[in-house]
Amino acid sequence: MASQTVTERLRELAETVGVSTGFWDWYGNWKHVEDASLVAVLNSLGFSLSSEPSHGEIDEAFRHNEDLVWLAPLPPTTVCRQGNEAEIPVHVPHGMGVWCHVETEDGQHHELQQLDRWIPPRMVDGNLIGRATFKIPNWLPLGWHRIVARHEDGSECSSTLVVVPQRLSSRLDDGHKRWGVAAQLYSTRSSGSWGMGDTQDLADLAAIVARNGANFLQINPLHAPQPGFPQENSPYLPVSRRWASPLYIRPEAIDEYVHMDSKERGVVTRYAHASRSHEDIVDRDLSWKSKIKALRKIFELPRSISRQAQFERFCAQGGESLENFALWSALVFENGDIDLPERYASIDAPGVEQARQRLASEIEFWQWCQWIVFDQLIRAQEGARRLGMDMGIMSDLAVGVHSKGSEIWSMPDAFAPGMSVGAPPDMYSQQGQNWAQPPWSPRSLAQMGYAPLRDMLRSVLSYAGAVRIDHILGLFRLWWIPEGMGAQAGAYVSYDHEAMVGIVLLEAQRAGAVVIGEDLGTVEPWVRGYLNDRGILGTSVLWFEKDGGGWPLWPDHYRRSCLAAVTTHDLPPTLGYLEGAHTELRNELGLLVEDLDQVRDADRIERERMVSRLREGGFIHEDDPSEEELVLAMHAYLAASPALLLAVSLVDVVGEKLPQNLPGTNAEYPNWCVPLHAFNGKEVLIDDMAHCDRVKRFLTSVDRYIR
């Protein structure tokens, strides 16, 4: 057998540690990942390879990778399903006795049985290391536990044990179909909004849709943006996914506001008016500039004993994570830019601890902002549930965070250095995509006991009865792009999906929440099957569900375990789509690379096929249905499918035509800044929706379809 080349050996190393050495392109061709990309990705995972590694270097990397397992007394984290037995290796100096037990989160103590299994010892760094294998029983309770190894010399070590559900148990287990409304909260304003939709608008919108039979209100991610200016418009590029955006606070709904005298209230009212000067756009900078002034005034007001106790409890629960987020916020706001100077560049930078003392009051302000926004979100959810929504708010979880955000500042070890997340080339983006978001390091996550994932989920689920995970494939693998290379020069890196999905299930089940995974696009078939088996719903969009001939898929061929929708935030509202407004808009902006007439023809054929399906299925009967009748018929079509959840976009309810987001654009279009408009081009306020015949007619029709 011929010896392997350096490239072959490098690829073997990559595959061993979960780095794919190739991928299928959109033409169905297998594309190899270049050696330089593999070296960069491997080094980000903790190896130390030169740019052109030798056989000896790669052999040493293999040994190092194997030695790491033996040098760890216990695996950093063990995740197992309840009801399944598992085994855990324990490493000790060869010949030393060792005993293991589990300490459950509620304080119980369970000794583990050592298996009668001989595994030859291994020489590591001149020391002979032995391995003992212990059995984890199948009857341990769900939860976050500790495995403790006790050595005969009296020393101890421990690691994380997470027992997770086999399958998520949720309210959907009753088999009943449910529906709800999907809205971009920032765009859904009222006469009381500060230039953008907020928590009070969320509560009021939930009340409107609940009265008409909706079971949930799906919204955009509410993750934290940077505290200063300019504000990031995209809700999918936060600085932290654990903490929330104070832009969504309604100042007048803060309990302490009622204690303001008339003069102080007048000042707050003027701030509110100043935030509303842009009626045709959602101006986050303008809104935040006014709102933060009001928040600082309210922050200075005295709090009752019980309110102060609630604030202190929130800070204690948030712990170091909240304090560090608040410290980072204070530093960035003081600096006036998200690019901090060297003395504050990371949590362990030389000036940080001194700043922590100097900015104590400012840190408390940013902690208080988090307390207020979470308090208002939780109240909105409680109100929705009281009105009969069995899920209430369905929040959204973004793929990642800003490369200069608070998460990478405060826990840099959790992220893969020198890497960015994106997507390989496809027919829509032939150079690939770079999302400028650092990926979590799979090895670091395990070392940290998956605490970042757990804490993020707990925060989001504290105010939501359901969560949609954007790009859920990211729990299985992500496209890593080395710094300085093009998006096409990346590689897929695998994550321990069994552990990560299991933790999602555990936290969701404890919160009584439903989980939906956004699994649109290219997803390996086994992934959808795996998620379905674990109780996570997929996502189906009417325009994307086609049969082999390119016709709309018949309703009875849809998945049962999914959230079905006619459109999404990355597509135009249905009226705009039916009119081809998205094509005309892209043409006007000079973004259309295909022939305009050909694209118009393709749009026309797609519309005609949809109308034909609707007629053939008996969903429309009129020769010339109105726009509203046509859009309703499309929702009736989806309601006839087995899909457990149906999401109705608020833009379709009111007859909006403008898209919220035009993928592939930046300055060309005001993405994520378009206020909600009706079919007549006028802005629709929540105040109007409460008494709007069209809104009531649309929602009650959908409720009738589902029931």
Show which residues each predicted segment covers.
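Short helix/loop capping segments that flank catalytic or ligand/cofactor-binding pockets
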Residues: W24, R171, S191, H402-S403, ...
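Acidic/aromatic-lined carbohydrate-recognition and catalytic surfaces
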Residues: N43-G83, E87-Q114, W118-R150, V163-M411
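Domain-scale activation on soluble regions of proteins
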Residues: R211, R343, H621-E622, F698-R707
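Structured C-terminal cap/extension of enzyme domains
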Residues: G655-R707
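Alpha-amylase-like alpha-glycosidases and glucanotransferases acting on alpha-linked glucans and related
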Residues: G228-F374, G400-A647, V651-D652, A667-E668, ...
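Basic helix-extension-helix modules of the SAP/HeH family
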Residues: M1-S48
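Short acidic/polar inter-strand loop motif in beta-rich domains
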Residues: E152-S158
